[in-house]
Amino acid sequence: FRATTVPVGEDQEPMIEQAREIVRRFNFIYGDTLVEPEILLPDNAACLRLPGTDGKAKMSKSLGNCIYLSDTADEIQKKVKSMYTDPDHLRVQDPGKIEGNTVFTYLDAFCRPEHFERYLPDYPSLEELKAHYQRGGLGDMKVKGFLNNIMQETLEPIRNRRKEFE
């Protein structure tokens, strides 16, 4: 598809660098034929290495803890609902932990201020949502529902564009 930029996570940089080496060598031998791909890393530090939906170190196809760009809306909703949160946050009134909570890691990566206006107008910011969760009185399902809305909005244009090429 003549891509010049490849969006990757930090763990994929070596593979792209290897491809760049091959392109340089190929072009040296056969003339300027191939485009050397540029690496595009996310600006947001939370996106550099997203954990798997089960809270494990990273997404893994073999562990089944990935959200794919090709997932349907129902598949994404199911995966978000099953995401790892704070195991000690058993009731809505219990205080919850943010650190290590996969749902909040994904919110850090994907949430933008305009999402609150559309999907959670009672909260002005992600910081306020986190503070309420830590105080108690905010359930996991409400936070997961918010994340699901964000993921659907983010991935829908990608899914639609992908369908054009299938």
Language model region names:
Residues F1-Q12:
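Conserved alpha/beta enzyme-core scaffolds, especially Rossmann-like or related mixed alpha/beta domains
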Residues P14, R20-E166:
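Conserved nucleotide- and phosphate/pyrophosphate-binding catalytic cores
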